[in-house]
Each structure stands twice: as C-alpha cells, then as structure tokens.
C-alpha cells in the first residue's frame, strides 16, 4: 500500500463515514446500499458472511437481522470478536471448512453474502479469472446451504467471464441482478451479483 493510497483513503467519504460511525470498513456501506435496493436480509435470518474480515459486512448483517438472527462469518484471516457473530477461520475452497459450516448450520441459511477478493496481481485478466473462481466457490457453497427462497450476494470483478457466471446464478435463483453500489469507487471494476429466491436447479 503506497503513501498516496493511504492519503486518498483518508480523503474518501465512506472511509471517514465508517470511522465516524464505528464501522470496521467502508465496505459496510456497499452492503447497506445493496440491501436497501434488493431487501436481502430479514429480521431473524441465518446469514453466512464469506471473506468477512475485518467484519464490516458482518456488522451490517447483525444490524439488519436483529437479535433473533444468527450470523456465521468465515475468513482465512483472523477477525476481532463481534457480538452476535460466530467466527470460523478457514478457506471456502477447503472441503473440510465447508463441511464444518454445513454441520454448524444444519437448518440451512437464509442468506449467503460474500465480499471475497483475490490478491491483486496487477494483471487484470488474471485477477478477473481469480475473482470468478471465488464467485463460483461462493455460489457452490450457497447452493449447499441456502433454504428455498434464500438470497445470495457476491462481489465480482467484471470482465469477459462475468456473463457466464451470471447465467449460473440465474439457474438457481428466481432473479439475478448485477449491481454497482454507490459506495464502490467509481473507477472500480467490482460489481455485485445478487440472486434472489433460491430454488434447486431445474431441468
């Protein structure tokens, strides 16, 4: 991270807003805006947050789900404890981690959210492909754990493989949308793919 990047971040509206409102990251506002648009999370929902650290999306999940909700947060890195959140350190690409989550939530989840991002190499084609790979892991997990009617949201770096991934989402959800929330930086290639009302795949 360069000095210029740090200086630009300090000037960023959502970065300053997150600091002032005691949120762990500016990404908090992306999920707030996505939920406002698509009504992803309902009170009492069981929510799984993939790539959760440092916890900004988990904070929003707890807020929107309320005291009756359950939030399970997964990341390969550590995350400071958070009231109302069960944290699991692991990799969604690891079958043992996936099985552990499924065993922890035998009743299934209402919502799966993912703000996972690959390590950026600077080669956009490579980074896009790695982003799609993470999206596919998130979707595969969502299809294992979501209840009928459940919702899904995943970050994706937009590129030539994006339409194919959106079609995969369309096969398992009544609605699929691609959304660029206002809190995403204007120059960013990131978008969020939202799947609403999960169903088992049909022929």
What does each of the following model-derived ranges do?
Residues 1-43:
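Class I SAM-dependent methyltransferase Rossmann-like catalytic core
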Residues 36-42, 105-106, 144-145:
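Glycine-rich helix-loop-beta junction characteristic of Rossmann-like nucleotide cofactor-binding loops
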Residues 43-53:
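Conserved class I S-adenosyl-L-methionine
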Residues 54-67:
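Conserved SAM-binding loop of SAM-dependent methyltransferases across substrates and taxa
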Residues 67-68, 145-151:
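Short glycine-dipeptide loop
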Residues 74-121:
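S-adenosyl-L-methionine
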Residues 132-148:
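A short glycine-rich, Lys/Arg-flanked "PGG" loop and its adjoining helix->strand segment in the class I
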Residues 159-203:
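Class I S-adenosyl-L-methionine
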